[in-house]
């Protein structure tokens, strides 16, 4: 499940950047925008569902004596939901020809924060590198 989550958010980020760039400031969305947006939404849902499933698994492991870090897990969940919301809002604003570059960069910064939290959490690469779980 962890690999599916990582693959889904990686594809979500790539699709977000491509979809954002497929909206021209003067002409609006290109013909490829609609399928890109639909694929982006599918991968957003897949990312949210797999992340929620990983959260449940970690909470269950913590209740049986292993794991922990409930606060960081909850913060990562909230950041993930905020990333998805910012992706949708920035694309909607760009389609309406409103200022959206600030939201785009806020989304990128929040993606980096969310990924950083994922790296240091119990199933992340840093934790497995040092045998912390």
Curated annotation (Swiss-Prot):
> What domain of life is recorded for the organism?
Bacteria
User: What is the recorded membrane topology of this protein?
Assistant: Multi-pass membrane protein
Q: What are the GO cellular component annotations?
A: plasma membrane
Write out the transmembrane intervals.
1-21, 42-62, 71-91, 103-123
Entry annotated with the keyword Cell membrane: yes
Q: What keywords sit in the KW lines?
A: Cell membrane, Membrane, Transmembrane, Transmembrane helix
| Location(s) in or outside the cell | Cell membrane
Xref: HAMAP family = UPF0344
- Which protein family is named in the record? Belongs to the UPF0344 family.
Q: What is this protein called?
A: UPF0344 protein SH1980
